[in-house]
């Protein structure tokens, strides 16, 4: 039998070598052999050691011994402010890789590890202290963590405080520095059962020292999400508060909140604003609502589904009570949804249905002045506009009445509409022609005019249109391309294409993003994909799936009550009768801001 040829190279490694080396160095230290430096801790206690071991274990000692300072050659180095027992632990760690962190040594050991640059020991101390957080020490622990740049511990302390803010004592909260209180109020994770509690927290802090703190009240009130404070509380308490009544910036915030609750504030036509985002602990969430459409078999649907992007959950809402037919239009006005017109194939509808999200039911409201189908609807300044080729009318939900307006100057077929910067825009092809145009309606003059915005993109027919952050987005129905128009600058742009086409899909703005759902994809298969576009990252991502593949459905966003998202072990901030105008015994949350009456 032929012997195998000998190997030219035999790779070898000993997995126990590192541990054996550490043991050998530790033994040399115990036997006091080859020691070449002595560290003197606070109090004069000496610790002989090996320079090479210290330099390998700590960037602090590496810089000390490798540089040109006197300590690089000195046989004795004095370490000011390092307790001897902490230096002992760090030296033992250098030679063994082990350290025992306890309640007695965690804080001083973290200080010493931070000073002498032992990051692993510092991290271990921080992890130990995270487990020791409680109501008595959480505020001080956050101060300590931030002072020593211990980010993990600082974040854990903040989460604990936000989660247990309702259990902290009044004295603890009132002694907070302004910057810290603002940080808590601005955080989505502040655990309050309703926004009035956040308002009371800010007010209590100011009232603890009015002469010094009153000047900070506008800044604090801006951090409170006033649009989600109940309407009666806004009128009875916020508006009546002298700190608000005497402050123009505060009155502007109050007016913004009241406009929001009266559906006069279009949050999609503004830039991102934290005040328009409810806190998860209150149970309110901005949701995507899908109405009607057709399924795989082209059967008409009367289902109404809602999607919570925070949890990824779908829920059923009250079904549409009548035959939807086709050619209807869907729009959200405040937190209610309106379905206008349509037909059954032989008869046009003038009926208007309203979905009241606070009670989860559909009711019929005043009919349109004219029956119509394949029209478009939008909301501008709290009023509902319906636009068709030959007529325009406007609905006032406060009076439940319709008003005829000037029709478009140039009739358009199957137009789409959106409100932007105080104007109503209609996009479509001129009646009987293939020419695509944009017309604009001015509510102050009741006049339509042609928009001269240069060469339009090559649309085959009217794209789906929505306004987000003051920009108009146009999603093509026959391709994945998306165009953007800035009416203020009169500029066109193109954003990255969608992941797929959505022929017959639906478009809505929600939470500062665009949501496109359903329709037929690139392979002509009916799709259940929901994808979202984030303007900050300029990227599309698939965020969910429809309950079933659907097309020709409508989608809008509203705020509605979901289960409060309170972290485990947390309790919402509650106001007791001794320090609040709110009845702490009644914490039923409103279904939406319009219930705040």
Curated annotation (Swiss-Prot):
The stretches annotated as Kelch repeats are 287-335, 336-382, 384-422, 423-470, 472-512, 513-560
Which residues are in the BTB domain? 35-103
Subcellular localization, as worded in the UniProt entry: Cytoplasm, Cytoskeleton, Spindle
Q: In which pathway does it act?
A: Protein modification; protein ubiquitination
Q: Which Pfam families match?
A: BACK, BTB, Kelch_1, Kelch_6
Single GO BP term: cell division
* A GO cellular component entry from the record: Cul3-RING ubiquitin ligase complex
Q: Does the keyword Cytoplasm apply?
A: yes
Q: What is this protein called?
A: Kelch-like protein 21
> What's the source species for this entry?
Rattus norvegicus
Q: Upper lineage ranks?
A: Eukaryota, Metazoa, Chordata, Craniata, Vertebrata
């Amino acid at each position: 039998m032929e012997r195998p040829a000998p190997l030219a190279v035999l790779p070898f490694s000993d997995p126990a070598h590192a541990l054996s080396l550490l043991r050998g160095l530790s033994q040399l230290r115990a036997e006091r052999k080859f020691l070449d430096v002595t560290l003197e801790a606070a109090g004069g206690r000496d610790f002989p050691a090996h320079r090479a071991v210290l330099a390998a274990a700590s960037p602090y000692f590496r810089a000390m011994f490798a540089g040109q300072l006197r300590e690089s050659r000195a046989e004795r180095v004095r370490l000011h402010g390092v307790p001897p027992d902490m230096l002992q632990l760090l030296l033992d760690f250098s030679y063994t890789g082990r350290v025992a962190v306890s309640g007695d040594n965690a804080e001083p050991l973290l200080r010493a590890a931070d000073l002498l640059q032992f990051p692993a020991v510092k991290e271990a101390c921080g992890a130990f202290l995270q487990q020791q957080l409680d109501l008595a020490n959480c505020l001080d622990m956050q101060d300590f963590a931030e002072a020593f740049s211990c980010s993990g511990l600082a974040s854990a302390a903040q989460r604990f405080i936000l989660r247990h803010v309702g259990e902290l004592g009044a004295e603890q909260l009132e002694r907070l520095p302004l910057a810290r209180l603002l940080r808590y109020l601005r955080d989505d994770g502040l655990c309050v059962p309703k926004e009035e509690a956040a308002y009371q927290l800010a007010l209590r802090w100011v009232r603890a020292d009015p002469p010094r703190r009153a000047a900070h009240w506008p800044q604090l009130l801006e951090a409170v999400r006033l649009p989600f404070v109940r309407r009666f509380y806004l009128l009875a308490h916020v508006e009546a508060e002298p700190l608000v009544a005497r402050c123009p910036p505060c009155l502007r915030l109050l007016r913004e909140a009241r406009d929001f609750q009266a559906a006069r504030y279009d949050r999609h036509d503004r830039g991102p604003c934290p005040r328009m985002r409810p806190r998860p602990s209150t149970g309110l969430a901005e949701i995507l609502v899908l109405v009607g459409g057709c399924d795989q078999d082209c059967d008409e649907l009367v289902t109404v589904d809602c999607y919570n992007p925070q949890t990824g959950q779908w829920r059923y809402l009250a079904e549409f009570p009548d035959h939807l037919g086709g050619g209807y239009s869907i729009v959200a006005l405040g937190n209610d949804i309106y379905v206008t017109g349509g037909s059954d194939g032989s008869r046009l509808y003038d009926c208007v249905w309203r979905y009241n999200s606070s009670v989860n039911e559909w009711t019929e409201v005043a009919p349109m002045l004219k029956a119509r189908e394949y029209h478009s609807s939008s909301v501008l300044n709290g009023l509902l506009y319906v636009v068709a080729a030959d007529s325009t009318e406007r609905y006032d939900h406060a009076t439940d009445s319709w008003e005829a307006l000037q029709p478009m100057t140039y009739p358009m077929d199957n137009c789409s509409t959106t409100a932007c910067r105080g104007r109503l825009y209609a996009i479509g092809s001129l009646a009987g022609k293939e020419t695509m145009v944009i017309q604009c309606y001015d509510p102050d003059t009741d006049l339509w005019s042609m928009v001269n915005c240069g060469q339009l993109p090559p649309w085959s027919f009217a794209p789906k249109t929505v306004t987000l952050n003051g920009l108009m987005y146009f999603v093509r129905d026959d391709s994945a391309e998306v165009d953007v128009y800035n009416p203020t600058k009169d500029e066109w742009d193109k954003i990255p294409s969608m992941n797929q086409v959505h022929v017959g899909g639906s478009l809505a703005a929600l939470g500062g993003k665009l949501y496109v759902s359903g329709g037929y994809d690139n392979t002509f298969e009916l799709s259940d994909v929901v994808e979202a576009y984030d303007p900050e990252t300029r990227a599309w991502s698939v965020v969910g799936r429809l309950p079933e593949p659907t097309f020709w459905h409508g989608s809008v966003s509203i705020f509605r009550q979901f289960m409060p998202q309170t972290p485990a072990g947390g309790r919402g901030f509650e106001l007791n009768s001794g320090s609040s105008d709110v009845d702490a015994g009644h914490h039923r949350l409103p279904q939406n801001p319009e219930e705040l009456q």
